[in-house]
């Protein structure tokens, strides 16, 4: 990896989706440089030409002359391009497909609900969104339950069994902020398999590194 040029990551200091990409870059030991933008800056040039959707993250990989946006697509690219020894991926078609399925669940079920709750909390007075907050909190917990039930069935410690994958790690940045989204809630009481899984992932050196970097930027 020493001969590689740094991958350029465009990110937001607080938003969890860019930290998903940073985590995979760290786990794979890839060189990268981060440019932090505020959300309004993502809606205008020059960034809007890189990501027409005007959201973060995006990457520029000078090693393969590719520019890419959408965190899930970036993760899949990084795995296919750089995880040649299978550190975060699996060999069989079945396991590869299951890992993609869990990544897609993260993108379609975990991230949007948390994003909506954050946006509504910033946009409306709490008294105006009581029922919406209740629904979103229940949906956040529902996804915890989905993960907990699957981990219990698999016997753990990870989504695909004994080996960690990029799909496990994709969930981490959002759940590192769980106390902010669901205050005064301990998932270990209701979902012990989920809690053990998340605790194990938080002990990984790459997770600790991005957590420390994010805290330093706060």
UniProtKB/Swiss-Prot annotation:
Pathway as given in its UniProt record: Secondary metabolite biosynthesis
Domain of life: Eukaryota
GO molecular function: transferase activity
Disruption phenotype: Does not impair the production of oosporein.
Domain GST N-terminal: 5-86
EC number: 2.5.1.-
Function: Glutathione S-transferase-like protein; part of the gene cluster that mediates the biosynthesis of the bibenzoquinone oosporein, a metabolite required for fungal virulence that acts by evading host immunity to facilitate fungal multiplication in insects. The non-reducing polyketide synthase OpS1 produces orsellinic acid by condensing acetyl-CoA with 3 malonyl-CoA units. Orsellinic acid is then hydroxylated to benzenetriol by the hydroxylase OpS4. The intermediate is oxidized either nonenzymatically to 5,5'-dideoxy-oosporein or enzymatically to benzenetetrol by the oxidoreductase OpS7.
Name of this protein: Glutathione S-transferase-like protein OpS6
Organism per entry: Beauveria bassiana (strain ARSEF 2860)
